[in-house]
Structures are given as structure tokens and as C-alpha cells.
Amino acid sequence: MTKSYQEINAETIDRWVEEGWEWGQPISHETYLNAKNGNWNVLLTPVNPVPHEWFGNLKDKKILGLASGGGQQMPIFNALGGNCTVLDYSDKQLEAEKMVAEREKYEIEIIKADMTKKLPFADNSFDIIFHPVSNSYIEKVEPVFKECYRILKKGGILLCGLDIGTNYTVDEKEEKIINSLPFNPLVNEEQRKQLEEQDCGIQFSHTISEQIGGQLKAGFRLTDIYDDTNGFGRLHELNIASFVATRAIKE
């Protein structure tokens, strides 16, 4: 039986984590203690930290980390008093969450699930959804935003890190534009070969219309936005944005 692209991506990310992928390295005990003392930052995108005012007071808030495994953000939210749940499709990313929770002796609900399917939560379940860059690993993003709207409480906050497509236009050295958009390896064999050669799993470009428009169509009100770079490489050196982070509210 042929593996789904979602399964291929989960296995790819598991392998990256074993190889030392930066987004799969859990925070240290010291970082956790610092967060308990009010010294903390988290990332939705590679470089610029999320403004603290985007969150408000997290004490006793129900927080979902959507495709947010790895033991980097959820431990911080726990240290700040949040009641946390994490959903991811990578076993290794979820193992990191379990490891930090056991080390720091806190409880977190850990769920392995595919975010392209109906999310396994009741309506109006969460105060905040934290969704760092990850929807570049799924083909259709609008259904995810609809599900986020469904499971957030009224007044709930959706925080997203979004790849805006620039990365998919350029070659590996980021010197030449080699691809048209949309980048979709399920329909473009040449793009699939590029990903296989670079061990990048199955990735997809998404437009601003899909991503911010998708949030608005789901019913959210956008309240803030900032852009960000890759953190390394030629596009970063030229200060060319590849990502945006968004804050939206369910009214």
C-alpha cells in the first residue's frame, strides 16, 4: 500500500530530528526555569519572537499546540500556567514533548493526529491555538483554519507562522528563480524530484490569499501581523521575507 504524503512527511521529520534538526531539539531545564521566572520567548517563524502581548495572561488558559511538537513551545506555555495539549504527526516530536513533561513533572495531553483530518476536539475547546510554520507540509490549508475556528472558544486567539512561498521559487543556493508557483509535488513531477534530492519530504507553497484569506473566510478577525526571514541563506542575507506570523481572533 502506498504511503500518504502525510505519512512520508512524518517519517521525514522523525529522521530529521534524529539528525539534530533545530526544530526538534527540546528546551533545557534552565530555559524552563527562566520561563517560570518570566524570562521567555517563543517562535512562530524562524527568527523574530512572538510579541508577548499577542498572548495575554496564560494562567489557566487552554492552549493547543497544533503541529507544534518538539518540546520547544509547549513547555514554555506550561511554565506560564497554561493547560496544554499538543497535536503532531511525528512520533519523535511527540517523544520530545513527553520527555520534557516528565523531566519537569507537569501534565500535557499528547495526541498523534493528522491535521488534514477533522481535529479530535469538541467545539469551543481552547482559548489559544499556537500553530508554528508547518502547513507547508499539507496540500490544503483552508480546512485547517475552519477546524481551528470550530475548536476555539469565542474570543479565542489563533497564532500562526506561515511560509508565503518565496522559498519554493528559488534554487538550493537561493540565487536563481527556478520554479513557478504553486509548488505542488503531487501534480508536478519535477518539483517532487527536487524535494527528493534535497530530502525535504513533501512540501507545498501557499499564497497569502489561501493563508490569511483562509483565516478570514473561516470567520477570524486578523488583529496583527509581522514578517520574517529564513534565519540563514541568501534570502535572509538580503532581508527578503519568506514568512509571516499572524494573530487572529474568533469573535
What are these regions (language model features)?
Residues 27-61:
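Conserved alpha-helix/loop element of class I SAM-dependent methyltransferases that forms part
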Residues 157-190:
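Conserved class I S-adenosyl-L-methionine
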Residues 116-128:
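A short acidic, Gly/Pro-enriched loop at the edge of an enzyme's catalytic core
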